[in-house]
Amino acid sequence: MSQQVGNSIRRKLVIVGDGACGKTCLLIVFSKGQFPEVYVPTVFENYVADVEVDGRRVELALWDTAGQEDYDRLRPLSYPDSNVVLICFSIDLPDSLENVQEKWIAEVLHFCQGVPIILVGCKVDLRNDPQTIEQLRQEGQQPVTSQEGQSVADQIGATGYYECSAKTGYGVREVFEAATRASLMGKSKTNGKAKKNTTEKKKKKCVLL
């Protein structure tokens, strides 16, 4: 879907990850500027957003997907012609980060070989939330740390690792600006291979802009 129309460049972004990890909220907040208060499982909704990076205007087609296993056979229909893939997990659900390695990276590499991947930690506002911390403690877990997220990003060969909160708006624009830049870079030959840690620790991201 690498097209250029007039002064605008078209790119396709696909977002994947476990159900209820924050994918749809992230897209809605970015494209519509509002946070949905009611959770409704996704069944492939598409959005279009205009993004300007480095003086270039990009028409970014945002393809949402459902993370539930019931949709494992339908989800691959969203992958063709993708220019960048966001793999999301939720900071308050350590299992969702584990599934990035157990499920999502294999699926993405199979259907989108060479396409840039960005790992996104959603719901970062819950990392220091007392109720979330206590609930996870009772289950013998704790919120995912930035270091754990970055480590997985390195292991799966992601172009970058970002954290955000759709609820507060923190980091949302940075995620999509990084994704847009990655989509303009073209296909990568390093997906799936470990990379050196290029994290800018203060900014919690590792895309070289």
From Swiss-Prot:
Effect of residue 60 to P: In RHO1-3; temperature sensitive, severely decreases beta-1,3-glucan synthase activation
Disulfide bridge positions per record: none
Modified residues (N-acetylserine): 2
Covalent lipid adducts (S-geranylgeranyl cysteine), residues: 206
GO MF, one annotated term: G-protein beta-subunit binding
Principal subcellular localization: membrane
Membrane topology: Lipid-anchor
Effect of residue 68 to H: Locks RHO1 in the GTP-bound form by abolishing GTP hydrolysis
Effect of residue 121 to C: In RHO1-5; temperature sensitive, fails to activate PCK1
Composition-biased stretches (Basic residues): 190-209
Chain span(s) of sequence motif Effector region: 39-47
EC number assigned by the record: 3.6.5.2
Pfam families linked: Ras
Effect of residue 167 to E: In RHO1-11; temperature sensitive, severely decreases beta-1,3-glucan synthase activation
Record-linked CDD domains: RhoA_like (cd01870)
Keywords assigned by UniProt, alphabetized: Acetylation, Cell membrane, Endosome, GTP-binding, Hydrolase, Lipoprotein, Membrane, Methylation, Nucleotide-binding, Peroxisome, Prenylation
Sequence positions that bind GTP: 17-24, 64-68, 122-125
Reaction catalyzed: GTP + H2O = GDP + phosphate + H(+)
Cysteine methyl ester modification, residue list: 206
Self-association state and partner proteins as the record states: Interacts with BEM4; the interaction is direct. Interacts with SEC3; the interaction is direct. Interacts with the GAP BAG7. Interacts with the GAP LRG1. Interacts with the GAP SAC7. Interacts with the GAP RDI1. Interacts with the 1,3-beta-glucan synthase component FKS1. Interacts with the protein kinase PKC1. Interacts with the G protein beta subunit STE4. Interacts with SKN7. Interacts with TUS1. Interacts with BNI1.
Family in the record: Belongs to the small GTPase superfamily. Rho family.
Protein name: GTP-binding protein RHO1
Organism: Saccharomyces cerevisiae (strain ATCC 204508 / S288c)
Gene from which this protein is expressed: RHO1
